[in-house]
Amino acid sequence: MLLQTIPEGLGLGALLVAVCAVGIRKGAVGMVHLYDPKVQERCMALGLTTREKIKRDALRFKAICIPMYLAYVLLCVYAINGAHTFWSGFWQCLVILSVMNLIDRFGIDGYWVGHTRAWVIPGTEDLMPYISKADKQKKWLFGTMGMAVFSLILAGIGMLL
């Protein structure tokens, strides 16, 4: 089953990359809701966005993307892979979400945001790196723990389906 769930995790990671690519298609300010508050404040001071737009974009991201990601995982684990027990569902969810988390940490945060110009917002370069060492540590900790918690919740939901 591991050989099936790892590619499913890669698919979820690709979905995350696609969401980010769409979000920054007109410039990185389109995803400024994911940046540190200092960067957000600078973008507002420069007239690149407003607090209302940042809040609206953050809400839209949470309302559309998170349910889409969770539905993808449930579809893979229960409809495609046919998990029947809580623990089988939990482990499959955990593998899929963990692979996506690795893509997010290394591929998106580590490389795309950290080593390319795609996420640079003009006028905020002095605030780089956009993801500080402390933020990276928090993302690793909460990302890893969060994936386990989400996996428990999804396995519980899967038992109700």
Language-model regions: role of each:
Residues 60-78, 139-153:
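Core segments of transmembrane alpha-helices
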Residues 40-56, 120-139:
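Short membrane-interface loop/juxtamembrane segments of multi-pass integral membrane proteins
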Residues 97-105, 109, 131-150:
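C-terminal halves and exits of single transmembrane alpha-helices
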Residues 24-65:
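Cytosolic-side membrane-entry/anchor segment at the start of a transmembrane helix
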Residues 6-31, 96-112:
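Hydrophobic alpha-helical membrane-embedded segments
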Residues 4-9, 62, 88-93, 139, ...:
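Residue-level signature of transmembrane alpha-helical entry/exit and packing/kink sites
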Residues 105-125:
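Juxtamembrane non-transmembrane "cap" segments at the membrane-aqueous interface
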Residues 153-161:
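Juxtamembrane boundary at the C-terminal end of a transmembrane helix
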